[in-house]
Amino acid sequence: MRTPLKIVLVGLPGSGKTTFGKALAKQLNFAFIDLDQVIEQETGNTISQIFEQEGEGRFRELESIYLKKVLEGIEGFILSTGGGTPCFNDNMELINEKGVSVYLDVSLEEIIRRLGKDAFGKRPMFTNLGDGEAILKLKNLLAARENYYMQAKIKLSGDDISTEQLLSELMVFFRN
């Protein structure tokens, strides 16, 4: 079995990209890379600081720069992207050109359950929003982003499924 060398996870915030990515990286003995962490390390600012001080437009620009840098660098990794990464600056096209994209498709209800009330406020896109506003924003994000996510080479349903089951499903794709 030849496993693709660059696996890129896409999906909404709370879809499990980081959790699943770390488990997959461990199973495949690959590096795990979180794009947000790369941006923070390279810029010396948190994602929240970039949003607050420079705006979302600048963040998306940085996101594209570092996505390209990661995808053109090492091989043998699992990359967890930000929820909006595929939707800007031809990023999804680049992801599909340089790696194997995997969309973790999780229902809004499950994402809301996973994130809980407190986690929304820790994410820049949801800062200063009440629960109802955060849920509405999440629904709007899915509507705006789903077309990009659906361009992924592999789609996995992440509702009511364990990380181990997701890993098994993904390995079936690689064997075929």
Give the location of each predicted region.
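P-loop (Walker A) phosphate-binding loop of NTP-binding proteins
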Residues: 12
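NTP-dependent small-molecule kinase module
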Residues: 2-3, 27, 143-176
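Walker A/P-loop
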Residues: 18
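ATP-binding Walker
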Residues: 15
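ATP-dependent small-molecule kinase phosphotransfer cores
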Residues: 35-96, 117
